Amino acid sequence: MRVSISKSSVKGEVFAPSSKSYTHRAITLAALSNESIVRRPLLSADTLATIRASEMFGASVKREEENLIIHGFNGKPNVPDDVIDAANSGTTLRLMTAIAGLTDGITVLTGDSSLRTRPNGPLLKTLNQLGASACSTRGNEKAPLVVKGGLEGKKVSIEGSISSQFISALLIACPLAENSTTLSIIGKLKSRPYVDVTIEMLELAGVKIHTDENNGTKFIIPGKQKYDLKEYTIPGDFSSASYLLAAAAMTEGSEITVKNLFPSKQGDKLIIETLKQMGADITWDREAGIVTVRGGRKLKAVTFDAGATPDLVPTVAVLAAVAEGTSRIENAEHVRYKETDRLSALATELPKLGVKLKEEKDSLTITGGELKGAEVHGWDDHRIVMSLALAGMVAGNTTIDTTESVAISYPDFFEDMSNLGVKIKQISEE
């Protein structure tokens, strides 16, 4: 699908979509429990992949109004009767690969062409050390993956610099191992807030994880635990909301109120602080969960460390493109291992809109200026598409392709933007 975007501003109120990362974890922990209610889940392409995988392991998931009623398999996953297809979802693939280590048989997991390019080596290696048997069919650490159950607890270490999803997956599976597990992180743990979200959810499900007090890079996980997630309401998603907040900050005459943004462990709440640093007119009523942004102020350049919040990189890159001065997005090599190599995608597309940009191995240097309309490629990546849509609001006369990819995390993105006043036109494919 292609859309064209004209110069626009945004006005009005919008409810932030529910958090993708919390939804993935809530569904997974509910499947490992007996019976649970997950309230206000995000139902997107990625989270539907987690629902399908949970059902293949033996859970029953029913939708009732805005809730999911989940009858789980009580910590004993069945051997799936078919290949698990995680579609485009890295979280689904990684979490379910670890859960496959708890079965009495063999599980095969795969995904779409993009997911089959993403690395899984550290997770496979650690599962093998823990007594399961895990490999890639092509011997390249990428899906399709084959996992034979047999997970036992022991002392292991895992590389932390590629993806925090490997650590989250093991933190979820290891409490059901026969013995306790000690998991030590080697190197710098990237995207740490996502691990904190996992631990927060595990505690709510009655599962104990002891974190090493010094620097939080060692986890002691007692075995033979039981999951009991009763009921959980999914909070709003700061990653998805970042596009709404940035849209208002970037455009003259805009004023937007985004609801359902309460304080949480999400690292991407950093977008509020980043917008403040850049000089945006933004207020956050934490108790009410309401963020208000008024456009019109000239944004200033910023230095942004992407270590903990890789999903904000496309949003910050577009903010930098309209800010005064030269911004740097640093510590961002792990952003290359997402649905696409997002640093390369941004470095390819933003210059088409007139942006002066320098790409290095783990950074982008962006000098703000005037944007001009162009035809740009969305790279089949929801975050690239949504960030280019923001640039289009400023540049005008901008056409973006592969826009159907927003279904991964924010299915109503274009509808919400249109309701807020963005001039969007769908172009029929020839």
Swiss-Prot record:
Swiss-Prot/TrEMBL GO biological process terms: amino acid biosynthetic process; aromatic amino acid family biosynthetic process; chorismate biosynthetic process
Pathway: Metabolic intermediate biosynthesis; chorismate biosynthesis
Keywords: Amino-acid biosynthesis, Aromatic amino acid biosynthesis, Cytoplasm, Transferase
SUPFAM superfamilies per record: EPT/RTPC-like (SSF55205)
Residues holding phosphoenolpyruvate: K20, G90, R118, Q165, R342, R383
Binding positions (3-phosphoshikimate): K20, S21, R25, S163, S164, Q165, S191, D311, K338
Keyword Cytoplasm annotated: yes
InterPro entries in the cross-refs: Enolpyruvate_Tfrase_dom, Enolpyruvate_Tfrase_sf, EPSP_synthase, EPSP_synthase_CS, RNA3'P_cycl/enolpyr_Trfase_a/b
Entry GO terms, CC: cytoplasm
Complex and partners: Monomer.
Similarity-based family: Belongs to the EPSP synthase family.
Name the UniProt record assigns to this protein: 3-phosphoshikimate 1-carboxyvinyltransferase
Species per Swiss-Prot/TrEMBL record: Methanosarcina acetivorans (strain ATCC 35395 / DSM 2834 / JCM 12185 / C2A)
Gene it is expressed from: aroA
